[in-house]
């Protein structure tokens, strides 16, 4: 049983705890927050859980793995401290804001013999591998992915506030929050693109509300949309020489149907998981138990390619975060 610590007290941390407990591999041990009241209120549903307001004391406690879901710009420093304390680390996507930060964390994790995971749930879903296996026998002609969901924080933004998700201080925006899922799908299926470009609707601080991206491959292109000021119900489509594969969504894939040009229909064997984060929690636990050595190396490589592409796309759109260095 892995002793789990949590940094970040938003709804996503509650979801991960639920999923982690459902796997039977984790036990919630401790929670860190800057305010004790916040930590205590967060822990109420879980019984007697240790609460900390000092991150060093938190990391010095008996923990095996730390899940981090704080604002994006805080990830790097917090992950670094956790690795130095010899804890395995699961970081909610995007794990970092620059490719160099990711490379540094991977190097540090290797030196301290701990595991480092970026939690991009669609990449760890069993459905992802089912789709990838199907595509391995197809000639790809292109793809179109969309992840756009109206943000609950948009009214506050329109009222003149700057919520973390729209802040350049905290590395927010549609590309970082939702577009990263599209990149994981594309790069996970097709590999690293040879070039990429992103255009966006931006706030005065350069953070994007909505954008359209293109990934260029030698023989095809992948287009995607990411938005936090609109909601899209479009499916994801992958175009092949023999037909079109349609996924119900970019994340939480529970249906995949291929329709050939002749009208033949093939429904891929997708089994929806009871909780959308359970499969990633299961995969990380198995990796820590040394049951997925080759997969783990592939995950690190994919994450490196995602962050390289993510950074290039931000630069092409002129999205700059406060005090970032690369």
Can you annotate each of these PLM segments?
Residues 1-46, 326:
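N-terminal Rossmann-like dinucleotide-binding module
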Residues 91-92, 116-118, 247:
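Hydrophobic residues in well-ordered beta-strands that form the structural core
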Residues 104-121, 140-142:
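Rossmann-fold dehydrogenase core element
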Residues 125-192:
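Predominantly a Rossmann-like dinucleotide-binding segment in NAD(P)-dependent oxidoreductases
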Residues 182-253, 284-287:
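Contiguous beta-strand/loop segments that form the cofactor/metal-binding neighborhood of enzyme cores
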Residues 271-282:
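Active-site loop of classical SDR/Rossmann-like NAD(P)-dependent oxidoreductases
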């Amino acid at each position: 049983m892995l002793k789990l610590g949590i940094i970040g007290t938003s709804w996503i941390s509650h979801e991960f705890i639920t999923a982690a407990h459902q796997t039977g591999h984790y036990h919630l041990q401790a929670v860190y927050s800057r305010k004790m009241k916040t930590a205590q209120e967060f822990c109420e549903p879980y019984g007697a859980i240790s609460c900390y307001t000092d991150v060093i004391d938190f990391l010095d406690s008996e923990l095996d793995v730390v899940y981090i879901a704080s604002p994006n710009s805080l990830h790097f420093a917090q992950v670094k401290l956790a690795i130095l304390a010899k804890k395995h680390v699961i970081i909610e996507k995007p794990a970092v804001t620059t490719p160099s930060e990711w490379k540094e964390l991977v190097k540090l994790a290797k030196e301290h013999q701990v595991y480092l995971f970026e939690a991009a749930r669609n990449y760890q879903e069993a459905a992802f591998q089912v789709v990838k296996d199907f595509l391995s026998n197809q000639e790809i002609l292109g793809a179109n992915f969309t992840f756009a969901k109206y943000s609950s924080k948009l009214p506050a933004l329109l009222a003149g506030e700057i919520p973390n998700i729209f802040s350049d201080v905290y590395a927010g925006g549609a590309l970082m929050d939702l577009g990263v899922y599209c990149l994981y799908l594309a790069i996970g299926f097709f590999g690293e693109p040879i070039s990429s470009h992103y255009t966006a609707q931006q706030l005065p601080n350069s953070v994007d509300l909505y954008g359209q991206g293109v990934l260029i491959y030698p023989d095809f292109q992948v287009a995607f949309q990411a938005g936090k000021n609109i909601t899209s119900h479009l499916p994801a489509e992958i175009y092949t020489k023999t037909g079109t594969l349609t996924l119900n969504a970019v994340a939480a894939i529970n249906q995949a149907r291929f329709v050939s040009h002749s009208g033949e229909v093939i429904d891929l064997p997708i089994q929806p998981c009871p909780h959308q984060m359970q499969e990633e929690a299961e995969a990380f636990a198995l990796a820590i138990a040394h049951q997925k050595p080759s997969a783990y190396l592939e995950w690190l490589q994919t994450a490196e390619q995602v962050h390289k592409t993510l950074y290039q796309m931000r630069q092409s759109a002129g999205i700059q975060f406060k005090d970032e260095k690369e």
